[in-house]
């Protein structure tokens, strides 16, 4: 995940989820965008990348190619839009083929299984999908707020709102909805043979390489999240 509003996403750090009798914890790693890799091998065993409230035009062509290759090989990309949709999508046109539209407040009613969710009024971007037949809307809310596409061996999810939205962050149903958004990826994570001490060491080693290559005066910030068994 890349974000210029890291502090507004800190609520995700340490969030626990129960999926298929397994406990998962989201752990955020904050890094500078200039350190986003250009070699897909440097992404190692990261479970997912979230881009939210970030100007993707700041990424180089080599970084975009790396991200695309990582998703193609089986990675999961999550993209938050909302009021920042235009800048978030600006550098991802070739990968997503999604255009930002007008932003308006939309009242979402979430499915009854999300006991604490109920409804929420969120700033929402109208999204236009050039390849609409490749996307499916999740049966999470009415109207739909999450769209998902299978991309080769990987997966891309686009939200009509931003996870940095103040209303969403303060909403009592927040954690339930976040869990639903990431549930499929977490379930796949539970079945991956590399989840264990050895793979966790590999992830930490990869992150160590990122952290030792930082440039201190870069304006854009980001986060990677790692999901591991608790």
Model-derived features: where do they sit?
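Aromatic-Pro/Gly-enriched surface loop or interdomain linker
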Residues: 1-54, 81-83, 187-191
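Short secondary-structure boundary/capping segments
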Residues: 15-19, 92-97, 173-175
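A short acidic, often aromatic-flanked loop/helix-cap motif at beta-alpha or helix-coil junctions
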Residues: 34-41, 103-106, 144-146, 166
């Amino acid at each position: 995940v890349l974000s210029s509003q890291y502090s507004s996403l800190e609520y995700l750090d340490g969030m626990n989820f129960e999926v298929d009798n397994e406990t998962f914890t989201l752990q955020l790693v904050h890094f500078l965008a200039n350190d986003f890799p250009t070699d897909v091998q440097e992404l190692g065993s990261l479970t997912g990348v979230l881009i939210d409230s970030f100007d993707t035009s700041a990424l180089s062509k080599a970084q975009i190619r790396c991200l695309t290759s990582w998703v193609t090989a089986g990675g999961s990309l999550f993209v938050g839009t909302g009021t920042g949709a235009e800048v978030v999508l600006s550098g991802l046109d070739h990968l997503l083929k999604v255009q930002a539209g007008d932003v308006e407040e939309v009242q979402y009613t979430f499915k009854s299984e999300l006991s604490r969710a109920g409804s929420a009024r969120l700033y929402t971007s109208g999204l236009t999908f050039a390849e609409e037949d490749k996307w499916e809307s999740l049966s999470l809310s009415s109207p739909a707020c999450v769209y998902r596409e299978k991309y080769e061996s990987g997966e891309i999810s686009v939200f009509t709102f931003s996870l940095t939205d103040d209303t969403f962050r303060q909403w009592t149903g927040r954690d339930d909805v976040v869990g639903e958004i990431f549930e499929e990826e977490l379930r796949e994570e539970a079945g991956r043979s590399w989840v264990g001490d050895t793979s966790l060491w590999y992830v930490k080693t990869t992150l160590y390489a990122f952290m030792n290559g930082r440039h201190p005066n870069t304006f854009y910030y980001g986060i990677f999240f790692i999901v591991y068994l608790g």
